[in-house]
A protein has these predicted regions:
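N-terminal small/polar loop signature for handling phosphorylated ligands or for N-terminal nucleophile
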Residues: 1-48, 146-206
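Short, intrinsically disordered, charge-balanced linker/junction segments flanking boundaries
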Residues: 15, 210-213
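Gly/Ser/Thr-enriched, mixed-charge loops and adjacent short helices
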Residues: 49-185
Length: 213
């Protein structure tokens, strides 16, 4: 996508690593971009990898805007009409730009600023977290650290990004099956809370002990 944009004279700003979809929405406004694009299967099976488009306001585009984009796509030959720039050449020319770390740090801070309550006793919270082989690990751990949550155990099989979702074919943390690895780890660690985020980290699921084992 960045190479196509660059080839058409549009500057593309990219995070240096995989980051959550909300961090893209933030970056669109933070950097004053005209639009944002995220390629993701979200909480769906890997075969449904898709294309999320955001407007200049950082919100997902409306159906009307999507229909206009689709109409433009249908006018071109996807084999012959698509321009593609060389990545390194486009970067050297300033058409592909790496987003500065401050953008992500300010995003985490903005999320932190929305906290409710004074956080009393939160430093004693024992937590198991799973990013479900997605993008949430970096931002979630940074946020938890800011909140004072230090007793965090990450589900090892689901810690690193893997677009095939090998441990969880349907990675929706609102569904018990998606949280199974986390629940199994909870049986060993006995935390106060299990937290899971879907692969693009824009929805979460939680579980707490019910006192029945």
């Amino acid at each position: 996508t960045a190479r196509v944009l660059a080839a058409n004279g549009i500057t593309a700003c990219m995070y240096p690593r995989l980051e959550p979809t909300p961090a893209l929405s933030w970056a669109v406004r933070y950097l004053g971009c005209g639009a944002g694009v995220c390629v993701t299967a979200s909480h769906n099976p890997a075969k449904y990898n898709g294309y999320k488009v955001y407007g200049a306001d950082g919100c997902q585009i409306t159906l009307e805007a999507a229909e206009k984009i689709l109409a433009a796509i249908e006018k071109i030959d996807c084999f012959d009409d698509v321009r593609l720039a060389d990545f390194d050449a486009a970067a050297a020319a300033g058409r592909i730009v790496t987003i500065d770390e401050k953008c992500l740090d300010d995003f985490v801070q903005a999320v932190y600023d929305q906290r409710v309550g004074d956080g009393a006793g939160i430093d004693a919270l024992k937590l198991v977290y799973t990013p479900l082989n997605g993008t949430g690990l970096e931002c979630v751990k940074k946020l938890l650290k800011k909140l004072g949550v230090t007793h965090v155990t990450v589900v090892p099989e689901q810690e690193k990004p893997d677009g095939d979702f090998p441990t969880c074919p349907y990675p929706n943390p609102e569904i018990r099956e998606a949280m199974q690895k986390g629940l199994e780890l909870c049986d060993k660690v006995r935390p106060d809370l299990l937290l899971g985020t879907d692969p693009d980290c824009d929805r979460c699921g939680t579980a707490v002990p019910d006192g029945k084992g």
